[in-house]
């Protein structure tokens, strides 16, 4: 296994070297080295409890690395072998990293209360649940994670049969320490991906694992899906055609890059195809926005105007949508033109670019420049949903 780090895989958060800079650039796992933790030592219960207790303190990185190695070893007899095979099948270059000595007994133990609930019978479930809880900090900031722990962790832990996780220390300082370990550029994130892959390889829990790994939709995203389906039904439009019409021209190329990236992974040959879905785990709204795909508010505005033409009153929900007044006018005009376009067999009419151009002319006048079409910030805040699963 090579130790050369040409690029570090960080859940698509920090891909370096212009991997997605232009429409012709393709994402290639073979250019990325994926560090993988393992252990040469046997795990005993006290070692695991010590590691759990130190999560959130100065020993967090080593403790979580050891816990990842423990779950890998317990899940497959060949230890990291299965994980390595799957990751290599996806095309990654692997670097093997030893977790080293057991956790330092002098480190602080902010999660001691959780560690004390661990016994031989529940150690694997509790540790796995802890790792997946920590993994959420690769997606959510400390404040949002604290809200998640306060509002949803107990219910979710109980539903997953890991009630011990209610003892997880959700102090913001503890969460910040964990987050600093799991942030982009930290090798531990990749070890947690190993846990995800192992779970995917076990048919008994594949459904839960896929729910965890699949790209999650926030409340905003789910609302848009519902609006989109209703609009397609109202218009009698093919969903693909309607989606193309809704993609504002400022975002089309970025959308294509994301689709290309995901297709490359999903179409990987052999066993890798089954695990391609894990690559989308971290593609939340924020990362789509990072590549220019920040049209959620605008598309929602258009969809609600479409549906209002079939169900009077739908547009009342537009009050809280974060778009400018000029765009609200444009959205109404686009909706009107889309209704005209699909008033028939649902497939004829002018293309999206021409339709949007006409709508702009009608709603804003021909003299308005494209400079005012700059994307607006529509970063909706949403809590982690119940689809966050531990196993």
From Swiss-Prot:
Disulfide bonds: none annotated. Its main location: virion. It is found in: Virion; Host cytoplasm. GO terms for cellular component: helical viral capsid; host cell cytoplasm; ribonucleoprotein complex; viral nucleocapsid. This is Nucleoprotein. Residues 346-391 are annotated as: Disordered. Transmembrane segments: none annotated. Encapsidates the genome, protecting it from nucleases. If expressed without protein P it binds non-specifically RNA and therefore can bind it's own mRNA. Interaction with protein P abolishes any non-specific RNA binding, and prevents phosphorylation. The soluble N-P complex encapsidates specifically the genomic RNA, with protein N protecting the genome like a pearl necklace. The encapsidated genomic RNA is termed the nucleocapsid (NC) and serves as template for viral transcription and replication. Protein N binds protein P in the NC through a different interaction, and can be phosphorylated. Belongs to the novirhabdovirus nucleocapsid protein family. Residues 368-381 have a biased composition (Acidic residues). Homomultimerizes to form the nucleocapsid. Binds to viral genomic RNA. InterPro entries: Rhabdo_ncap_2 (IPR004902). Keywords: Capsid protein, Helical capsid protein, Host cytoplasm, Phosphoprotein, Ribonucleoprotein, RNA-binding, Viral nucleoprotein, Virion. The lineage of its organism: Viruses, Riboviria, Orthornavirae, Negarnaviricota, Haploviricotina. GO terms for molecular function: RNA binding. It comes from the Viruses.
